[in-house]
């Protein structure tokens, strides 16, 4: 009676260890993909911010508008990011683009933080334009 009980305990322990190793391996891969997605999102936001600075606060309305920005050729993250991720371009230059990850993993809060940063930039540029206009 003692031998089958010991085999069951060993089998359960081995299965638990195997599940832990498999889970660790899977989550490590997801974390690495999330870091890559975050880098791509950051590169796109940097190009959008640069465009806005160069164009008096106006936001780009297409991917073609930011493709000529400095650093574009040296950053494969931007081109790859625009291919894999979604940027909902605004209909007018006073609205911020909205980023979406298309189901790709991202870091905790990355999309919300970057979209808030773009909205804040658009809001500042609209406030700055209306403050400069004569009454």
What kind of region is each of these model predictions?
Residues 58, 74-135:
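Periplasmic/extracellular, small/polar-rich flexible segments of pilin-like filament-forming proteins
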Residues 8-24:
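Hydrophobic membrane-insertion alpha-helices, especially the h-region
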Residues 1-5:
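Short, Lys/Arg-rich N-terminal segment immediately upstream of the first membrane anchor
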């Amino acid at each position: 009676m003692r031998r089958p009980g010991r085999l069951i305990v060993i089998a359960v322990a081995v299965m638990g260890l195997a599940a832990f190793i498999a889970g660790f391996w899977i989550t490590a891969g997801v974390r690495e993909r999330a870091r890559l997605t975050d880098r791509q999102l950051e590169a796109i936001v940097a190009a959008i911010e640069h465009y806005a600075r160069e164009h008096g606060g106006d936001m780009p309305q297409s991917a073609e508008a930011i493709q000529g920005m400095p650093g574009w050729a040296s950053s494969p993250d931007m081109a790859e990011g625009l291919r894999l991720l979604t940027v909902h371009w605004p209909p007018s230059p006073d609205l911020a683009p909205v980023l979406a990850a298309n189901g790709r993993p991202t870091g905790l809060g990355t999309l919300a933080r970057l979209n808030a940063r773009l909205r804040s930039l658009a809001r500042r540029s609209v406030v700055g334009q209306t403050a400069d206009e004569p009454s």
